[in-house]
Amino acid sequence: MTTEPTPASATAASSAAAIEQAAHAIVEAAIEQFYELRPDLRQRHGPRGIAVCREDCLYHIEFLAAAIRNGSVDAFVQYIRWVDGVLRAHAGGSHGLGQMLELLGQGIRRSAGEAAWTAAQPTLDAALAALQGRVEGHGLYAMPPTSALARSYLRAILQGNRLLAQQLILDAVREGMPLRQVYLEVFQPALYEVGQLWETGQISVAQEHLATAITQTILAALYAQTPLAPGRGQRAIVACLSGNHHEIGARMAADFLQWAGFDTLYLGANTPEASFLAMVDDFKPHVVGLPSSLPRHIEGVRAVIEQIHANFRRDRPTILVGGLAFNLVDGLWRQVNADVWGHNAGEAVDRLVGAAA
């Protein structure tokens, strides 16, 4: 789901920048206050849990700044509802997210200034209202499968029945369903629903991983049986950067690029930034794809794009981004200085090819 942003003003942009610059000071103060107020959580979390909480708070600040810059209050509210759902399902008991948001707001006022606090307050208030149950919402993965095939496929992968799942897809392809439709109307909504089920604690991490692994196996089988399109004489590289293990979307993007005639290298999940940039230097691609599933991946993508702009000025590749993290905030792809974005891999590649025509 995307939200329509209010055009960013100079004040919003400067406030977002001030919050980003003060992020570490804001978070450190909030963490210290939070665990003083909640000794029960300090004991439960321990040093490792506190470190995770600190990292999560930096993500909250990063996403808040992006929402302010883009005028997308609803996107931040949706993100916080998702965080709340994950914490409730997996952390158990009282997790203190609302209390932490209050403390982060106080930190913004102290460390980033009154103007930044004025810009942030409506967004934080909306998120707090949502946590208190006054606003209806849904999870990050709100794209339930609607077709009978997608629902049958979802049941098969949740049961761990690879043979049935594969047979459902192969039968559909034999009966004439285009691969694009299989990818976008079966795989994507089914896996989004898997994410939603994990988010709400209805399935385990192991079940989520199994569903993903089955889909990866079927994707590979389909790709091996698909005739390649005539080459365009252009190259592409697609990768998930460090910390991003959600690679199905990236695999789909790589396949769509290959079908569009690009000689495509797919580097997979958790690719170190330095290795990716070295590959760009060696392979000299015309296009790079950097999908991002979660908001916390955005900063790494932004940093790599900055390096590409700085180091490959003469033959800079076209930069394509997408994924759930970018879908939450309209215009976020422009904020990271990408060239092309789409709601899904098919749309992104269509826009890429259309722009080059």
Annotated model-derived regions:
Residues 216-221, 228-256, 260-283, 290:
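Conserved binding/catalytic microenvironments
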Residues 256-258, 266, 271-331:
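Cofactor-cradling patches in redox/metallo enzymes
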Residues 322-357:
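Peripheral docking tails and interdomain loops at the edges
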Residues 81-84, 102, 170, 273-281, ...:
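Amphipathic, non-transmembrane alpha-helical secondary structure
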